[in-house]
Regions:
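Transmembrane beta-barrel strand/turn architecture of Gram-negative outer membrane proteins
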Residues: 14-17, 34-67, 76, 83, ...
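A short glycine-leucine-enriched loop at secondary-structure breakpoints
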Residues: 29-33
Length: 316
């Protein structure tokens, strides 16, 4: 309706029409601010003489789509030795500890966070970090040296519920519309959600036969809890951690039980057999559930317009 506003403050349930202006048309209305064009959104107004109450609800589901074509030939390690035992990064070093069940299994470079180590071999059993953790259900159990990383294990199905309630009424020389929308979304990333609330009021009336008054008010509330991050931004960008880094032999589902009885976190990227603290990467499920970051934004948008019909069909 002519008021410049943030796109995040727009409630699509209130939109009646959208028009795109380019070039001189946008510049004529908005000056330099319209130099790149303008999107004109007209919101709904009251239309029913008797009064109309409308209620709508939408349910939307979303899921993570994995389109990464990741190599499945080599496991954790940095140099991919071609002969058994010729590099420290190879898996082919026998476990020398005293944990029952692990004798005859191999260890590898747990500290390394890339997957160019020894080639996979289903005949080989290896010691995982969980095999060394006496508080884990995997304690004393070796795993098969094979590809196990599935990024879909990091995510869930996200669901969005949106409810809109509006009331509109129109009589001679007067129309009004009030609407409220509440939207709650659980994200595909565990322990993430978002809230959107929109309140809108729009009225038009003619106090005299030659004057028209239009008033519009919009309130928007937006809260994000653990919104997804992007780029090289530390351990919170979990997807980046397992596409740029990571070990493809790790089965992430084994690490969903991420917390030990003492409160410390289990991770696949330990420093060594004797040091189970994280070398570079924490447990992704711990990052999802133990960090809670909330951001709240609010917008109040007021706009008003008065037009006066003068004699000789002139307007001001």
């Amino acid at each position: 309706e002519g008021a410049i506003t943030n796109k995040n403050s727009i409630n699509m349930d209130d939109v009646e029409s959208i028009n795109v202006l380019k070039g001189p048309a946008a510049t004529a209305l908005y000056g330099s601010r319209g130099g790149a064009g303008a999107i004109i959104i007209t919101t709904k107004a009251g239309q029913s003489e008797k009064g109309l109450l409308e209620v709508s609800h939408t349910l939307q589901a979303e899921t993570y789509y994995n389109h990464f074509n990741m190599q499945k030939l080599y496991g954790g390690g940095g140099y991919g030795g071609t002969e058994k035992g010729n590099r420290a990064q190879d898996i082919y070093d026998l476990y020398s500890g005293d944990i029952p069940g692990l004798q005859g299994a191999y260890v590898y470079d747990y500290n390394e966070d890339t997957s160019w180590g020894a080639a996979y071999d289903p005949a080989v059993k290896y010691v995982t970090p969980l095999s060394l953790d006496e508080t884990s259900g995997h304690y004393g159990k070796p795993a098969t040296w094979q590809h196990g990383l599935d990024l879909r294990d990091l995510y869930r199905t996200g669901v969005t519920n949106t409810t809109n309630v509006s009331f509109s009424k129109s009589v001679k020389d007067f129309n009004t519309r009030v609407s409220f929308t509440n939207s709650y979304r659980t994200g595909v990333q565990p322990n993430s959600d978002a809230i959107r609330r929109f309140l809108g009021f729009k009225t038009n009336f003619k106090p005299t036969p030659w004057m028209n008054v239009s008033l519009d008010y919009k309130y928007t509330y937006r809260q994000d809890h653990n919104a997804a991050e992007s780029g090289y931004n530390g351990s919170r960008t979990v997807l980046q951690e397992y596409t740029q880094w990571g070990q493809t032999n790790v089965n992430l589902k084994d690490y969903k039980d991420y917390k030990r009885p003492d409160g410390s976190w289990r991770t696949w990227n330990i420093n060594s057999v004797n040091n189970q603290s994280a070398a570079f990467h924490d447990n992704p499920y711990a990052l999802f559930h133990e960090y809670n970051h909330r951001t709240i934004y609010q917008w109040n948008v007021f706009s008003g317009d008065v037009s006066v019909d003068l004699p000789y069909n002139l307007k001001a």
